[in-house]
């Protein structure tokens, strides 16, 4: 893998708020692959599970597609973008309806190999 090349994985339409996901992402940004997995495994947040899956997936992409060693991977970029909102309604008194917005997000992880 040359200096400019990186390996990427994306989880789309994850049914959790991007704000909640970003709180967890900030804790693993810039860390090694193994360190990030360890942190994610023991965090008390629900956002840890989908992030763990994406980090695991990007490492598998690096190993299978580029023959990189998982022990040398470092998370160079990790971010959560806002996805579409699921629109639902809550019935209220006198025939009214309140809108419920259920947010989704897209989680992107980019890793680079250190030599």
Swiss-Prot record:
Part of the 50S ribosomal subunit. It comes from Thalassiosira pseudonana. The keyword Transmembrane helix does not apply. This protein binds specifically to 23S rRNA. The globular domain of the protein is located near the polypeptide exit tunnel on the outside of the subunit, while an extended beta-hairpin is found that lines the wall of the exit tunnel in the center of the 70S ribosome. NCBIfam families: rplV_bact. HAMAP family: Ribosomal_uL22_B. InterPro entries: Ribosomal_uL22 (IPR001063), Ribosomal_uL22_bac/chlpt-type (IPR005727), Ribosomal_uL22_bac/org-type (IPR047867), Ribosomal_uL22_CS (IPR018260), Ribosomal_uL22_sf (IPR036394). Belongs to the universal ribosomal protein uL22 family. The keyword Ribonucleoprotein applies. It comes from the Eukaryota. PANTHER family: CHLOROPLAST 50S RIBOSOMAL PROTEIN L22-RELATED, LARGE RIBOSOMAL SUBUNIT PROTEIN UL22M. One of its GO terms (cellular component) is chloroplast. It is found in: Plastid, Chloroplast. SUPFAM superfamilies: Ribosomal protein L22. This is Large ribosomal subunit protein uL22c.
């Amino acid at each position: 893998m040359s200096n400019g090349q990186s390996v990427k994985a994306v989880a789309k339409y994850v049914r959790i708020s991007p704000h909640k996901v970003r709180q967890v992402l900030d804790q693993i940004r810039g860390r090694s692959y193994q360190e990030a997995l360890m942190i994610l495994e023991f965090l008390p947040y629900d956002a840890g599970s989908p992030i763990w899956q994406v980090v695991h997936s990007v490492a598998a992409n690096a190993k299978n597609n580029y023959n990189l060693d998982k022990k040398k991977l470092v998370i160079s970029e990790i971010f959560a973008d806002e996805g579409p909102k699921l629109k639902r309604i809550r019935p209220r008194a006198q025939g009214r309806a309140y809108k419920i917005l259920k947010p989704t997000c897209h989680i992107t992880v980019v890793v680079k190999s250190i030599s």
